């Protein structure tokens, strides 16, 4: 098994004075998955001296933390026992490491999201930091120097304080400072007013929200799987275009997820009468009136889903599955506010977070996020993606770095289903071309 040698590990605090006090967390923050979201960025050496110099990365991180000061805080409790962010300025973890085993091309050839890759390239999460007050640092960073001169930047941001778009906002700001931009000229100033997503005084739950309700114990066949096989699959711009055309012009995310859903049902050999549910997330930022500020930093996504029988998904054209996916992702402000109001009446810290059943799929869109272009002064990443997948039945849809219009999928399925999925998916993509 490959190893890395940790060279340094320290705490980086904001480079200047920051506000004290606390940041109130919304119901969507409390309902987010507990713990961290580990991600990795692979960078090819550009031939310049000082490539990803530790001092430059550390100093720019400290300056970014001035604007994003809650990231340097800790989770705590308010007087009513509600989780909040205490803006203590205690700092974040910053480590450097070296790998004598991996060159970048080797790593890109064998990388799949898994525990081993997370353990190699992302600092270990503090045991008490998942949801407990006075837990550990909310951001963990590691710069690993490969034997070829390339670099893996691994980071894990606590999900209680940021969703994917907010994480991208932080990375974009940090990268701009590393490139030499003044810290005061952040691309978009962050907004930490989470009360913009508070429940309404007169709560109005207008919809059913099964995604936030405890589920009865499923039969053995449908049990969630903590063991999984994962894969990275890339679709070219032409393949994405052909798939969207087959889906009557559906969005890239809906078209890709529709095909993944179909192929997963086939690979899992689900009975035609079995219910299969496609879970997804909706970003509420532009769906509210007025919209959230451009720099809203927190969790602004809500869970949603749509269900069908496996027979319907498999036997219908892929465009039908895309229309189902649209039904799961097209809700507007009324639905979003209904979710927030519903969560006001439940214990948001103890919602179901154990994964999805063996018949289901959870799809997350990272399309359009600046993570794929995170340039710290030495060029954009050759690859960016999640370091782990958590459980079977998970798929991220992302822009493929450096490949205009191409899409990368990070996918996890049951180990026995993955080989058949890869075959069926490749056959379907070839047939569409």
From Swiss-Prot:
The active site is formed by 159 (proton acceptor), 375 (proton acceptor)
Keywords from the named record: Acyltransferase, Transferase
Q: Name one GO molecular function term.
A: hydroxycinnamoyltransferase activity
Q: What is its EC number?
A: 2.3.1.-
The entry's note on the tissues where this protein occurs is: Expressed in roots.
> Coiled coil located at which positions?
none
**Ligase among keywords:** no
Q: Does Metal-binding appear among the keywords?
A: no
Function noted in UniProt: Hydroxycinnamoyl transferase that catalyzes in vitro the transfer of an acyl from p-coumaryol-CoA to glycerol or shikimate, to produce 2-O-p-coumaroyl glyceride or coumaroyl shikimate, respectively. Quercetin, glutarate, or malate do not serve as acyl acceptors in vitro. Can use feruloyl-CoA and caffeoyl-CoA as acyl donors.
Which family does the record claim for this protein? Belongs to the plant acyltransferase family.
Q: What is this protein called?
A: Hydroxycinnamoyltransferase 4
